[in-house]
């Protein structure tokens, strides 16, 4: 999965997919009443990027729905996964459950079209704080009470705080999650970060009793760091330059071993080669 980083304006969906992304990451900010409000990152952000592009969250979802609904004039067949980077730092821990419920209702109405031929992309809820695990249970409760528990088949999870892998496993246990787990690791492109924790995550993914299904690394903009991440065995790379990742995947060393994921590749299944 080539994951376009910080895609917060509707126009950027086309831009990143046209550069080679089959997945995008979108920032979601919340208001003081736990409602998802804007797709917005803010300053500071990655080096070389404009930090302030934004849409109202529900409007972005409508644009995203068009981009992922077969038959729509804006449809991109290869856009198959969306990571919502949930900026829950503005919320108290006890607001997490309500934020999850409101997020689910927004998605149900504006992205999934109330279960009637909505967008088809798989969705990852990426949460920065382990203490906010109730966002997951709230999200699930809302979809169930709205009569659409089947949509949880399209939803996966990530805790993005670079926490100890054992602590992450514990948070999932509390949230009742047993699958659909992506594990992120990384840092802003302005700084360097080694691959030690990525290797630990990959080892967990490949062990018989691990909780992780997929591992992705962020934010990778250079060819050499792309090669290093692929050599470590990641499933996804988040980038500001999808074309760079696509170029490296075309190199003879990687062409035989990796390919770009399509809609038929289940993002919740651990890849066994």
UniProtKB/Swiss-Prot annotation:
Keyword tags: Cytolysis, Dermonecrotic toxin, Disulfide bond, Glycoprotein, Hemolysis, Lipid degradation, Lipid metabolism, Lyase, Magnesium, Metal-binding, Secreted, Toxin
Swiss-Prot/TrEMBL catalytic activity: an N-(acyl)-sphingosylphosphocholine = an N-(acyl)-sphingosyl-1,3-cyclic phosphate + choline; an N-(acyl)-sphingosylphosphoethanolamine = an N-(acyl)-sphingosyl-1,3-cyclic phosphate + ethanolamine; a 1-acyl-sn-glycero-3-phosphocholine = a 1-acyl-sn-glycero-2,3-cyclic phosphate + choline; a 1-acyl-sn-glycero-3-phosphoethanolamine = a 1-acyl-sn-glycero-2,3-cyclic phosphate + ethanolamine
CDD domains: GDPD_like_SMaseD_PLD (cd08576)
Pfam families in alphabetical order: GDPD_2
Covalent S-S links between cysteines: 45-51, 47-190
Enzyme active site: 5, 41 (nucleophile)
Expression sites by tissue: Expressed by the venom gland.
GO biological process, one term: lipid catabolic process
Any one Gene Ontology cellular component term annotated for this protein: extracellular region
Keyword Glycoprotein tagged: yes
Top-rank taxon: Eukaryota
Glycosylation sites: 250
InterPro entries linked to this entry: PLC-like_Pdiesterase_TIM-brl (IPR017946)
Molecular function terms from GO: lyase activity; metal ion binding; phosphoric diester hydrolase activity; toxin activity
Cofactor(s) required for function per UniProt: Mg(2+)
Intracellular or extracellular location(s): Secreted
Family named by the database record: Belongs to the arthropod phospholipase D family. Class II subfamily.
Function: Dermonecrotic toxins cleave the phosphodiester linkage between the phosphate and headgroup of certain phospholipids (sphingolipid and lysolipid substrates), forming an alcohol (often choline) and a cyclic phosphate. This toxin acts on sphingomyelin (SM). It may also act on ceramide phosphoethanolamine (CPE), lysophosphatidylcholine (LPC) and lysophosphatidylethanolamine (LPE), but not on lysophosphatidylserine (LPS), and lysophosphatidylglycerol (LPG). It acts by transphosphatidylation, releasing exclusively cyclic phosphate products as second products.
The protein's name: Dermonecrotic toxin LarSicTox-alphaIB1b
